[in-house]
Amino acid sequence: MVHDLLAFLAERMLEMNKQKQQEIKGFLGWLVGFVGAKVEDLTPKTKLQSYYEHDYDSFLAVIKKNRKKLAVDPARREPAETLQAEFEGSMGKLGPLRERIRLTDDLIDAIVYRLYGLTEEEIGIVQGETHQNRMDKNK
């Protein structure tokens, strides 16, 4: 029974991560078409590729920094409003999805900890390592 639950949760994680990647790809594809430049040609491209981890002001600052490479002027009202609307629309989809992914991940962790009979101290050690691993991946 636990195996079936873990298999179901793993399948849900895969589906939610697929949805997340589709939204990110869709937004970045729209952005390329709107600004007339490839994300790879802008700096810092990693901040644009992980736009969902930043607020709109940070996103807009990166776009403005690359103004000379763009077909639109992000300082003008109309392009800025369009950028903000699209950014917020994407974040509106990604925010709840990322939260569901986090909660599902936490549930899987809790089930595994229980399955292996880990103590609070052991869980703390595992979570500390997990946290460090996530920090390393985000560099």
Where are these regions (language model features)?
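S-adenosyl-L-methionine
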Residues: 1-139
